[in-house]
C-alpha cells in the first residue's frame, strides 16, 4: 500500500471553532493510484471540516485482501464491481443509507443497471468511474516495428510473432487476472466470462507463448512508461492511457500515445464507492459520497482522470474532448463490442489465481 502523504497533510483543513483535537471529523479513503483530482479533496475539507486521510492501491487483489482480513481502517473504498459481488456475500460492506445521499438522482440509470448485476438493487455501492481494458501504445515505436501506427486487434499482443517484434521496446500488462485472462479467452473465441478449468488452461497456454515478450506485469507503472517513451505498448485501463497521452503531449518530446478498443471486443468495468462494514466514520463517508455526486465535482474528477463516470448530470459540465471520445463514452458500435464478467466463486477465484501465478512466473 502506498501512502499519499501529501493528502494527509494538505487536506487536514479543520474548522477549529473551539473543537478539541479528539473531536475532529475524519474520513479514511482507499482508492486507486492517480484516480482523483487533488483539489477535490482539498475543497471537500474546506467546506465540511472533514479531514481526508487518503491511501492508494493498484490492484483489486490488494484491496480485497485488506477487506477480507477485517479492521481495514477505511471508511470509503473503491473496488471494481465484479470483485464487490463476492465481497458483499462475505459481509465486507454495509448498505448505503440513501436518505443521506440527497443527490443520488444524478446517477445514470444505464450504469446503475449494469452494476446491479454485482450489487442487486444498488444497495451497497455508487459508481465512481467506469471504462474499458484495452491497448495503449506509442504510435512511432509500433510503426517502426509493425509497419502500422493503428492497432485494432488483440493479435498485436496475443500473436507470439507480433509480440516478439515489440519485446525490445517493452510490453506491459496489468497485474490482474480478471482483466487479462478474459481478454485472452475472448481472443481465442471463447466466452470471456468462462471460469472452467479447460478454458483457463487454454488461456494459460496462450499467455505462456507470449510471456517472454512481456517486460512487466504492473497496474500503474505503464502510465509513465508510455508517457516517457520508455515502453511501446501496454494492456491497461482506458483512462490511464489518456493520462499517459496527456502527459506525453505536455512533455513535448515527440511521444504520441493512442488507445484502442480492439475489434474482437474488450472488458467494460465499473469502479464503485462503498463503505466497509467496520467503518468508524459512517456519517462522514456518506457525506463524502454525496459530495462526489455533485455534477461539478464528478465532472472535475472525470476531466482529471479521463474516465467516464456514472453521473449523468455531470456530462454537460465535462470537457467535450472526453464526452465525445467513443473510447471513453462509447457509441453504440463500441458498446456492442464490450463484455462484462460475472463474479467468481471462491473455488473459481483460486483457479484464476493459480493460472495467473503460472503466467506471471512463466512456469
Walk through the language-model features, giving the residues of each.
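Paired acidic/hydrophobic, glycine-rich loop segments that form the ligand-binding mouth/hinge
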Residues: 74-79, 215-216, 232-237
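Extracytoplasmic ligand-binding site segments that recognize negatively charged/polar headgroups
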Residues: 78-84, 88-213, 218-227
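Early extracytoplasmic/lumenal segment of secretory-pathway proteins
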Residues: 23-87
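Short beta-strand->loop
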Residues: 94-105, 155, 251-267, 276-278
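Conserved C-terminal helix/tail region of periplasmic/extracytoplasmic solute-binding proteins
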Residues: 224, 332-363
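A ligand-binding cleft/hinge motif common to bilobed small-molecule-binding domains
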Residues: 83-86, 233-254
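Mature extracytoplasmic/periplasmic domains
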Residues: 271, 276-337
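Periplasmic-binding protein-like
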Residues: 200-209, 215, 253-274
Amino acid at each position: 500500500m502506498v501512502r499519499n502523504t501529501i493528502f494527509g497533510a494538505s487536506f487536514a483543513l479543520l474548522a477549529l471553532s473551539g473543537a478539541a483535537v479528539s473531536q475532529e471529523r475524519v474520513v479514511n479513503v482507499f482508492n486507486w493510484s492517480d484516480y482523483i483530482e487533488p483539489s477535490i479533496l482539498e475543497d471537500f475539507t474546506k467546506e465540511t471540516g472533514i479531514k481526508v486521510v487518503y491511501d492508494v492501491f493498484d490492484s483489486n487483489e490488494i484491496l480485497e485482501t485488506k477487506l477480507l482480513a477485517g479492521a481495514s481502517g477505511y471508511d470509503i473504498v473503491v473496488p471494481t464491481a465484479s470483485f464487490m459481488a463476492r465481497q458483499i456475500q462475505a459481509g465486507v460492506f454495509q448498505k448505503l443509507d440513501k436518505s443521506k445521499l440527497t443527490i443520488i438522482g444524478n446517477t445514470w440509470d444505464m450504469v446503475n443497471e449494469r452494476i446491479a448485476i454485482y450489487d442487486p438493487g444498488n444497495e451497497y455501492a455508487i459508481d465512481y468511474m467506469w471504462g474499458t481494458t484495452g491497448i495503449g501504445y506509442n504510435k512511432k515505436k509500433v510503426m517502426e516495428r509493425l509497419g502500422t501506427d493503428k492497432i485494432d486487434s488483440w493479435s498485436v499482443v496475443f500473436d507470439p510473432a507480433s509480440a516478439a517484434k515489440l519485446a525490445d521496446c517493452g510490453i506491459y500488462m496489468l497485474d490482474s487476472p480478471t482483466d487479462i485472462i478474459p481478454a485472452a479467452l475472448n481472443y481465442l473465441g471463447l466466452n470471456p466470462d468462462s471460469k472452467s478449468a479447460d478454458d483457463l488452461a487454454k488461456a494459460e497456454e496462450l499467455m505462456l507463448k507470449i510471456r517472454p515478450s512481456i517486460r512487466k506485469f504492473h497496474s500503474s507503472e505503464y502510465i509513465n512508461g508510455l508517457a516517457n517513451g520508455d515502453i511501446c505498448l501496454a494492456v491497461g485501463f482506458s483512462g490511464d492511457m489518456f493520462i499517459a497521452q496527456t502527459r506525453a503531449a505536455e512533455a513535448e518530446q515527440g511521444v504520441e500515445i493512442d488507445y484502442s478498443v480492439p475489434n474482437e471486443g474488450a472488458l467494460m468495468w465499473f469502479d464503485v464507492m462503498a463503505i466497509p462494514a467496520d467503518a468508524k466514520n459512517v456519517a462522514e463517508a456518506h457525506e463524502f459520497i454525496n459530495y462526489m455526486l455533485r455534477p461539478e465535482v464528478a465532472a472535475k474528477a472525470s476531466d482529471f482522470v479521463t474516465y467516464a463516470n456514472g453521473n449523468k448530470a455531470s456530462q454537460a459540465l465535462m470537457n467535450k474532448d472526453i464526452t465525445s471520445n467513443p473510447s471513453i463514452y462509447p457509441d453504440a458500435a463500441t458498446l456492442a463490442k464490450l463484455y462484462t464478467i460475472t463474479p467468481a466463486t471462491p473455488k473459481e477465484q483460486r483457479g484464476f489465481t493459480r493460472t495467473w501465478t503460472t503466467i506471471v512466473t512463466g512456469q
